[in-house]
Amino acid sequence: MLSPQKTRFRKQHRGRMKGISYRGNNICFGKYGLKALEPAWITPRQIEAGRRAITRKFRRGGKIWVRVFPDKPVTVRSSETRMGSGKGSHKYFVAVVKPGLILYEIGGVTENIAKRAILIAASKMPMQTQFIISG
C-alpha cells in the first residue's frame, strides 16, 4: 500500500475540499486519463484497486502513471469514547482529490482498450470521474 516514508507532523486538520484543482489537471505522461469530477478522499486501497483493474485489462503492453499519492494522515477515535482527551490515534493515509485532478494516465494502448480499462478503474473510485483524451 502507498504511504509516505516520513511525515513532518503525525496528525493534521481535516481541512475543506473547496474549489478546483489547479495543479495536476493536465495529461502529462500518457495519452488517456481518468479525471475526478467531485471532491473526495481516496485511500491507498482504492488507488491500488484502480491500478490493478487497469493492468488486468492490458494483459501485455501499455503503461500506467498513478498521479495521486496518499499523504494526509487520518485519525480515528475508538468507539464509545467520551468527548475531550485529545485527538484520536493515526489510522491510515488518504489522498485529497479536488475536481479536475487526473488520477491515472495510460499510454501505449488503443483507445478502445484504454476506455474499457479506465471505466473499470472508475467504478472503484468513491466519486464521479471522466475518461479524457489528451490533445
From Swiss-Prot:
Q: Name one GO cellular component term.
A: mitochondrial large ribosomal subunit
Subcellular location(s) of the protein: Plastid
GO BP, one annotated term:
mitochondrial translation
On whether Phosphoprotein is a keyword of this UniProt record, the answer is no
One Pfam match, given by its short name, reads Ribosomal_L16
What superkingdom heads the lineage? Eukaryota
InterPro entries tied to this protein = Ribosomal_uL16, Ribosomal_uL16_bact-type, Ribosomal_uL16_CS, Ribosomal_uL16_dom, Ribosomal_uL16_sf
Claim: Ribonucleoprotein is one of the keywords in the record? yes
GO MF term list: rRNA binding; structural constituent of ribosome
CDD domains to which the protein is assigned, alphabetical: Ribosomal_L16_L10e
**Entry keywords, A to Z:** Plastid, Ribonucleoprotein, Ribosomal protein
The cross-references to Gene3D superfamilies, in alphabetical order and at most eight, read: Ribosomal protein L10e/L16 (3.90.1170.10)
Similarity-based family: Belongs to the universal ribosomal protein uL16 family.
UniProt-listed NCBIfam families: rplP_bact
Report quaternary structure and partners: Part of the 50S ribosomal subunit.
| Name of this chain's protein | Large ribosomal subunit protein uL16c
Native species = Epifagus virginiana
- The gene for this chain is rpl16
